[in-house]
Amino acid sequence: MKTITITNLKGGVGKTTTAINLAHRLASEDKRVLLLDTDHQANLSRFFNAQSERNIYQLFIGKAAPQPYAISDNLHIISSDMETATINFRLIGQMAWHSVLRNKLVSSGFTALYDYCII
């Protein structure tokens, strides 16, 4: 699974729009795409009306395996919520969040199911 991260500290620069367009493009080319909404504002999740209690926060804390929401056959999303804002505090003294995320995706089996992961 190839991972593409779209990030910027400034809000309103098009991160969500870029992720949506890129994901749709890859899915239209028969690629299996997993979108990860890691933003506590959950704009990506709201755009697709994808709210779940088994979300990205649950993946980070290891409480439950997240349940990806199917947008289409080739496009799925793991949603976010306000609790996601506390992840950095929970990971103090551990490895960086991106390393934790990578390890969780591998151990949950997601890397074998998708061609691309867009964060």
Protein language model regions, located:
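P-loop NTP-binding core
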Residues: 1-119
